[in-house]
């Protein structure tokens, strides 16, 4: 597939997702980095987003809970270019009923080449990167060209 560029803005749209056993870890991470995160637009799956808002006061667009379609909502927004960064603390030691949705979410984040953190270390690397508070160009699939080729 051909690629094109997309600009991630200075004020990023960040999706925050955490499985049940990881919610406390994500909440602690958000609290540690609250001063940086409040400069960005935050979205989250339902329970996670409501917990973050309740504990920090940060404005969070809370979607549905992951098992009820929230992971797929985040994935759709990634495909539409509406999410710039995904922080997803998933639990590798416990299966969840919506494992296919989890795989799909991670696949879409990879297809659309957005920064993804699945653990504390990577989340810290992303938020401490000089790119976090500046605009940056990324390569993404050139969907209009892809579609035009398929419709020939």
UniProtKB/Swiss-Prot annotation:
SMART domains in the record: MGS (SM00851)
Domain MGS-like, chain residue ranges per copy: 6-152
Its job: Catalyzes the formation of methylglyoxal from dihydroxyacetone phosphate.
Gene Ontology molecular function: any one: methylglyoxal synthase activity
Taxon lineage: Bacteria, Pseudomonadati, Pseudomonadota, Gammaproteobacteria, Enterobacterales
Enzyme Commission number(s) from the entry: 4.2.3.3
Biological processes annotated in GO: methylglyoxal biosynthetic process
Organism field: Enterobacter sp. (strain 638)
Name assigned to this protein: Methylglyoxal synthase
PROSITE patterns: METHYLGLYOXAL_SYNTH, MGS
EC top class named in words: lyase
Pfam annotation, one family: MGS
Lyase among keywords: yes
Keywords: Lyase
Family recorded in the similarity comment: Belongs to the methylglyoxal synthase family.
Cellular component annotations (GO), alphabetically ordered: cytosol
Gene from which the chain derives: mgsA
